[in-house]
Amino acid sequence: MATEISTRGRQRAIGHEEYSLYSSLSEEELLQMAIEQSLADKTRGPTPAEASASSQTNHQPGHFHPWTRSPSSPENPPARAPLGLFQGVMQKYSSNLFKTSQMAAMDPVLKAIKEGDEEALKIMIQDGKNLAEPNKEGWLPLHEAAYYGQLGCLKVLQQAYPGTIDQRTLQEETALYLATCREHLDCLLSLLQAGAEPDISNKSRETPLYKACERKNAEAVRILVRYNADANHRCNRGWTALHESVSRNDLEVMEILVSGGAKVEAKNVYSITPLFVAAQSGQLEALRFLAKHGADINTQASDSASALYEASKNEHEDVVEFLLSQGADANKANKDGLLPLHVASKKGNYRIVQMLLPVTSRTRVRRSGISPLHLAAERNHDAVLEALLAARFDVNAPLAPERARLYEDRRSSALYFAVVNNNVYATELLLLAGADPNRDVISPLLVAIRHGCLRTMQLLLDHGANIDAYIATHPTAFPATIMFAMKCLSLLKFLMDLGCDGEPCFSCLYGNGPHPPAPRPGRFHDAPVDDKAPSVVQFCEFLSAPEVSRWAGPIIDVLLDYVGNVQLCSRLKEHIDSFEDWAVIKEKAEPPRPLAHLCRLRVRKAIGKYRIKLLDTLPLPGRLIRYLKYENTQ
């Protein structure tokens, strides 16, 4: 027998004559090499080359005593793992590490079976050799004959030892199971004719019929069914042979199984039926077959997901179309309350969404606590968003509280999702459809300011977004829009030009009196850690944060252009006094402010912040309009 030596990059067989490769090495070197190889093999899995070589190498079965067999693989039993260098060297050095023994020859029984030598087997039996004794893995010569497809040898062993026909290996594999796995139909038929039990399963509870379906061997299935194999036997996952054949879209095998008594409504451990498998995997022909044979088109798994839901989730358009044509209910929700339309919108499949829209109940959608608009906006599926808006879905439908809590910012509108994604087109679509920009806990305008997207800001303001938005969970004495824009003076000026209220920035609670210590970094960005109402943050407090304080002078300078006579608190004066070039800002704040400036503020206040954009329509000289719009600061 040749011994296989595993190397890092490849496998090669080394026979008696090839041990000369290591003849120049001392015993200590050989042992060291073997130990290193053994340690390396333990710390790494098989390389792609090794896996490929293993799949292409002819099966080398286990032998009778004293040779051993490696555990078999359920997919192609029994695969024998190649010997590593450590085992090869240790086989060369027997019990005495310093004595070399010759490798044993192949067992004569196995040799006779592999070569199909029936006469040799008969002679051994006549000579009294016991061929019904298993090896350490429970394999009999009968198993070997079935595995190698040696029909003549198989019949000899059947006749000599009829009581071993259903004997199993340690992996619970019978000769019939092995013959089926190897697709030796003549051996399969011979065993069944000799009385082999067709429903004995392996350790995974897979029967020969199941393996025949797995290998799409219709003739093997036909033979097994003819010999009364149980078509409804379940493996350890609860799958039947019909589940397996449906997953492979094997209509011929499905026909044989159903004719042999297979139940089309059989369920696995997750309550999944064959029709559900067909819908899930997109096997349209299998689906048609099962529907024709009476399978429930509205079948649901243990999580309440329907076949239509799974087909929509996996974007099998033809399957969805067929299910709907057969009357599938589009209003069956899964355990999370989601309908097929929800998952189709989430996936962004426009065609499936169009098929589901006419058959989906708006009441069921509202009851789910989430609109398909939310899912389409969250995933930037603009085409689906357009289809849903065209179907007149409620653009202001909020997320249910339990769903909103899944997001840290407690978002609730589809518009918020679009703004968070910085999707200007989707934002415009939703606003044109009537989306309210002031419904969320945190205004979408604040998100747009954080992104610095002027186009989105303008869209939101044009459609009524509150430019003086506040954050309820982080209360401030001044608009949060100013807080978010402080690090970009041009953005701050843009917001002030559009009517943002700067007066609260100078209405300090402490005035000229002493202020509390400057806040720690992150003080204004952390949520409250207890149940007490958070304290209201003053403008001067926020301006004292390290990441903002270096811009204190320019920020105050911009804000002074949009307020009248105000009083700087002691903290703001400290900031201005900290840099001598900012002295002019302190002078600018001293009352009284210029009359023209006060008149400008009065006119803008009379117009109102929501009509500031109409300043150009006033019957006034162009120079005055430019002054009102802060286009001429002189």
Swiss-Prot record:
Belongs to the ankyrin SOCS box (ASB) family. One of its GO terms (cellular component) is ubiquitin ligase complex. It holds the Pfam family Ank_2. Residues 26-45 form the UIM domain. It is found in: Cytoplasm, Cytoskeleton, Stress fiber. One of its GO terms (molecular function) is ubiquitin protein ligase activity. Highest expression in muscle, heart and spleen. Highly expressed in cells of the first and second heart fields in the developing embryonic heart. At 9.5 dpc, robust expression predominantly in the left and right ventricles (RV) and to a lower extent in inflow and outflow tracts. At 10.5 and 11.5 dpc, expression is restricted to the myocardium with no expression observed in the endocardium. Pathway: Protein modification; protein ubiquitination. The lineage of its organism: Eukaryota, Metazoa, Chordata, Craniata, Vertebrata. Residues 36-82 are annotated as: Disordered. InterPro entries: Ankyrin_rpt, Ankyrin_rpt-contain_sf, SOCS_box, SOCS_box-like_dom_sf, UIM_dom. The SOCS box domain mediates the interaction with the Elongin BC complex, an adapter module in different E3 ubiquitin-protein ligase complexes. The modification Phosphoserine is found at residue 371. GO terms for biological process: actin cytoskeleton organization; cardiac muscle cell development; cardiac muscle cell differentiation; dendritic cell migration; heart looping; intracellular signal transduction; myoblast differentiation; podosome assembly. ANK repeats lie at residues 104-133, 137-167, 171-200, 204-233, 237-266, 270-299, 303-332, 336-365, 368-397, 410-439, 440-469, 476-504. Residues 580-634 form the SOCS box domain. This is Ankyrin repeat and SOCS box protein 2. Keywords: ANK repeat, Cytoplasm, Cytoskeleton, Phosphoprotein, Repeat, Ubl conjugation, Ubl conjugation pathway. Disruption phenotype: Embryonic lethality with death occurring in utero around 9.5 dpc. Mice have placental defects, that subsequently result in failure to form a normal cardiac septum, leading to embryo mortality in utero. Embryos display defects in vascular development and hematopoiesis and increased protein levels of Flna in the heart. Conditional knockout in the whole heart and in the first heart field results in pericardial edema and embryonic lethality. Substrate-recognition component of a SCF-like ECS (Elongin-Cullin-SOCS-box protein) E3 ubiquitin-protein ligase complex which mediates the ubiquitination and subsequent proteasomal degradation of target proteins. Mediates Notch-induced ubiquitination and degradation of substrates including TCF3/E2A and JAK2. Required during embryonic heart development for complete heart looping. Required for cardiomyocyte differentiation. Specifically promotes the ubiquitination of SMAD9 and targets it for proteasomal degradation, leading to avoid excessive accumulation of SMAD9. Component of a probable ECS E3 ubiquitin-protein ligase complex which contains CUL5, either RBX1 or RNF7/RBX2, Elongin BC complex (ELOB and ELOC) and ASB2. Interacts with SKP2. Through its interaction with SKP2, likely to bridge the formation of dimeric E3-ubiquitin-protein ligase complexes composed of an ECS complex and an SCF(SKP2) complex. Interacts with JAK2; the interaction targets JAK2 for Notch-mediated proteasomal degradation. Interacts with TCF3/E2A; the interaction is mediated by SKP2 and targets TCF3 for Notch-mediated proteasomal degradation.
